[in-house]
Structure formats: C-alpha cells, structure tokens
Amino acid sequence: MTHLDEAMPRWQFRERHEIHINADPQRIYDAIRAVRADEITLFRTLTWIRRGGRNLPEGILNAGKTKPILDVATETTFRYLADDPPREIVVGTHIARGIDAAMNFLITPEASGCRVTTETRVFAADAKARRRFALYWFVIRPGSGIIRRMWLRAVKRRAQA
C-alpha cells in the first residue's frame, strides 16, 4: 500500500505515468524535490495556456524559475500529505467545493535502477462536483499528462547527471 492509497483511497479521476531511472532511490528522491518549472519541458507554456495568459501570483500555474516546483506548490495551495524519503512524496490540494486532488511520486527499486511513477487522483464528493470536474478534466488532462511525463524526464536528467 502506498501513502497515496492512504491519503486518497477513493477517486473518480486518475492519471498515472512512469519512467525507469538508473540511479539509487535517494538520488531520485533528491531530484524529485529539486526539479524547477524551467526544467520541465513545456511546463511554462502549458500552464500559461491553462491560466489564459493571465499573470497570477506565484503558484503551481505560475511558478518562477528559481524554486523547486514542489516548494512552490506546497508554499501556496498544496500541502504535504506524506513525505517518506526515499520512497514516496504525496501532496494534495482542495480544488473547488467538493473536489480534492492528491498526487504522488513513488520510487520502486528494481534490478538496475528504479521505476518512478507519478499518479494523480481526484475525488469529487457528489454528482454535481463530478460533472463539473469531468468537463474540466476532459480539457486539461492532455496537457496535464504532457507535464507529468516531462516532469519525470526532468527528474531522470537530474538523477542521472
């Protein structure tokens, strides 16, 4: 069982991506904690589109270039739900009335290197919230998937450097 399973055992929306990294778990964990938005290919472009080109205060949709992206997230709307070095990090946020999200990075040692997964889960408390979020998810999920895959690649570059 993962900490994500403990934090969000039920959900209606889910996205999962993985990558193999030739590094030890602690090095990968440190890379996850250190990656900045400018290291994630297309991050700034896709979040600019998501926010409609508006300038917003610093946050996950408007991350600066100097801080690790997880620090930006947890200093604004996200909170750490679990931090289990060097195995798993889970952060979560309240998106809107009746809608909560959690995401993790899970490091699983393998024969050579590690498998690193990131998963997002969203729970909507009632049918109205589910319908509202389903439309939003339909629109943002492709960009979200691109960001997650690029985020994993940025972690890999850092960990294998």
Predicted feature residues:
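Beta-strand/loop substructures that line and gate deep hydrophobic ligand-binding cavities in soluble
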Residues: 98-144, 155
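Short, intrinsically disordered, mixed-charge
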Residues: 33-37, 145, 157-160
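Structured surface interface patches that mediate subunit assembly and partner/cofactor docking
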Residues: 6-11, 45-51, 55, 90, ...
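Hydrophobic-ligand binding "helix-grip"
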Residues: 69-112, 136, 149
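Hydrophobic ligand-binding cavity/cleft-lining segments
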Residues: 1-70, 77
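Hydrophobic pocket/interface hotspot
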Residues: 28-32, 80, 118, 155
